[in-house]
Amino acid sequence: AHQFLSAQLADHTLARTYECIVTGNLREDSGTVDAPIARDSRDRKRMAVVPGGRRAVTHWEVIARYPGYTHVRCRLETGRTHQIRVHMAYLGHPILGDTVYGAKKAVPGLTGQCLHAVGLQFIHPRTKALVSLSCPLPEEFTAMLRKIDR
């Protein structure tokens, strides 16, 4: 079962979907970031877009735009450490509340960054049926959407 699921991860048939709120407004309605990621040479706790790093691909689309913020859906083609956080910051739109790759100060009323896994889809190892799992946005995330919509 583990091998079967690992193979889906490797051949990009396992689908992982996230939602996030980024700072600023993305100009395009959708796009793909295909930029390699590796450890940041200046700070080993961080990851960064680095030539020669491991291939990392994030597909994104705008859900809604607000003054100074954008609600985004991301689909991972690869799965690198902090991939969405690194790629959104690379685009110049770090995730709201991300003090590692974005703002240096915490956002009042937010305990972490506005990034949430909303969906996972894979083929079941034994039954070969398509399994779709979803998880609603947490209250803290939806409260932040209400706050920025004012």
Where are these regions (language model features)?
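RNA pseudouridine synthases
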Residues: 1-150
